[in-house]
């Protein structure tokens, strides 16, 4: 329904739906400034964009916003969701048609060589005859041009068809259809080396193979660094799921990881999360206790010991999940920054 809304909204504004995003799940009380702030943080990898309009959806009791892009973008760069006021906002995107992309590149190359697709087809078929590579039936005059065309179109061909990676979730034991970490990592590393595509496409294919806890780890890292590379993703997975630390040493490291003096609380939580997921993977923390374990360590390791009160978290209430906690902290940090800015303005006014 939301993709159809994106297409209809763009059609009404006479714009290309592939140059737009629909942001859904926005709180009814969220202001334009708060929407802009969330977009600035969540859509940074996309470059220039513009908030075009907002709409209230009665069936969800939430707002949606239309965002315009300056150009079509890669599916790998568009986040599926971004943190915003009141919770997580969904990002709806109409990806480019890979077949059209390939044909566009082919036509662009041929136009530069003064050829048409029909002429290229006849050259490959050797004037409508059968193509016999063993007998060297490609005309000598076309050979260099065809080689150049294949080289130029290799990235597009790689994107159109590729062998998907095996599935890894980090669960123990692996579920049917999933690989254990060592075998998965070896296979994935070899495949990624062989792909001749941009890093963003490699990262998209990597994320496509992840499930469960493994996918959660990379999502956490992407929140902190939207431009994280494939190598950095693999390194993080190695640190969490590779056999390195014993559970006791890991638990000590987790419990002695504290917020640094100049470090934001949200950055501390993001730094802490891979260690927590590793403890869960080793069986040192039960999965149903992970939210409470996270909250306990954040409160214990935070510079300001009143953080539970600042976040309005009751002593006897259930611990929030990771994304919910991060949203609470982001709102708290935004309020603190706004208060500090106001104080600075007031001090400048009265001095």
UniProtKB/Swiss-Prot annotation:
Q: Which GO terms describe its cellular component?
A: cytosol; mitochondrial outer membrane
Work out whether the entry's keyword set contains S-adenosyl-L-methionine.
no
One GO BP: positive regulation of release of cytochrome c from mitochondria
Q: What does this protein do?
A: Retrotransposon-derived protein that forms virion-like capsids. Acts as an effector of BAX during apoptosis: enriched at outer mitochondria membrane and associates with BAX upon induction of apoptosis, facilitating BAX-dependent mitochondrial outer membrane permeabilization and apoptosis. Required for death receptor-dependent apoptosis. When associated with RASSF1, promotes BAX conformational change and translocation to mitochondrial membranes in response to TNF and TNFSF10 stimulation. Also promotes autophagy: promotes phagophore closure via association with ATG8 proteins.
Please tell me where this protein is predominantly located: cytoplasm
Describe, as the record does, how this protein assembles with itself and its partners.
Answer: Homodimer. Under normal circumstances, held in an inactive conformation by an intramolecular interaction. Interacts with BAX. Binding to RASSF1 isoform A (RASSF1A) relieves this inhibitory interaction and allows further binding to BAX. Also binds to BCL2 and BCLX. Recruited to the TNFRSF1A and TNFRSF10A complexes in response to their respective cognate ligand, after internalization. Interacts with TRIM39. Interacts with RASSF6. Interacts with ATG8 proteins MAP1LC3A, MAP1LC3B and MAP1LC3C. Does not interact with ATG8 proteins GABARAPL1, GABARAPL2 and GABARAP.
Where is the protein found, in the record's own terms? Cytoplasm, Cytosol; Mitochondrion outer membrane; Extracellular vesicle membrane
**Do you know which Pfam families this protein is assigned to?**
PNMA, PNMA_N
Its domain description in UniProt is: The protein is evolutionarily related to retrotransposon Gag proteins: it contains the capsid (CA)subdomain of gag.
GO molecular function ontology, one term from the record: ubiquitin protein ligase binding
- State the organism of origin: Macaca fascicularis (Crab-eating macaque)
Q: What is this protein called?
A: Modulator of apoptosis 1
Q: How is it modified after translation?
A: Ubiquitinated and degraded during mitotic exit by APC/C-Cdh1, this modification is inhibited by TRIM39.
Annotated region RASSF1-binding: where? Answer: 202-205
State the residue spans of region: BH3-like. 120-127
């Amino acid at each position: 329904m939301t993709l159809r809304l994106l297409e209809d909204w763009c059609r009404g504004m006479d714009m290309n739906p592939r140059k737009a995003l629909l942001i859904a799940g926005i709180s009814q009380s969220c202001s334009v400034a708060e929407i802009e702030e969330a977009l600035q943080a969540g859509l940074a990898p996309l470059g220039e964009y513009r908030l075009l309009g907002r709409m209230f959806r009665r069936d969800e009791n939430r707002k949606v916003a239309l965002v315009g892009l300056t150009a079509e973008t890669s599916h790998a760069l568009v986040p599926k969701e971004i943190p915003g006021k009141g919770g997580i906002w969904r990002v709806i995107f109409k990806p480019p048609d890979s077949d059209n992309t390939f044909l566009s590149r082919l036509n662009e190359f041929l136009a530069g060589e003064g050829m048409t697709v029909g002429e290229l087809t006849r050259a490959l078929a050797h004037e409508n005859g059968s193509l016999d590579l063993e007998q060297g039936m490609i005309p000598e005059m076309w050979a260099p041009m065809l080689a150049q065309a294949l080289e130029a179109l290799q990235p597009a061909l790689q994107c159109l068809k590729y062998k998907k990676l095996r599935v890894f979730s980090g669960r123990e034991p692996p579920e049917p259809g999933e690989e254990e970490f060592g075998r998965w990592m070896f296979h994935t590393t070899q495949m990624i080396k062989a792909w001749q595509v941009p890093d963003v496409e490699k990262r998209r294919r990597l994320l496509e193979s992840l499930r469960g806890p493994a996918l959660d780890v990379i999502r956490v890292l992407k929140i902190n660094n939207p431009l994280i590379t494939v190598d950095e993703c693999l390194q993080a997975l190695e640190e969490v799921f590779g056999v390195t630390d014993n559970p006791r040493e890991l638990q000590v490291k987790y419990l002695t990881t504290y917020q640094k003096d100049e470090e934001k609380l949200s950055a501390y939580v993001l730094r802490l999360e891979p260690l927590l997921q590793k403890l869960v993977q080793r069986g040192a923390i039960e999965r149903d206790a992970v939210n409470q374990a996270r909250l306990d360590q954040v409160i214990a390791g935070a510079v300001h010991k009143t953080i539970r009160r600042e976040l309005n978290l009751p002593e006897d209430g259930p611990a929030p999940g990771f994304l919910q906690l991060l949203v609470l902290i982001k709102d708290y940090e935004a309020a603190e920054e706004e208060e500090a800015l106001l104080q600075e303005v007031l001090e400048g006014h009265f001095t």
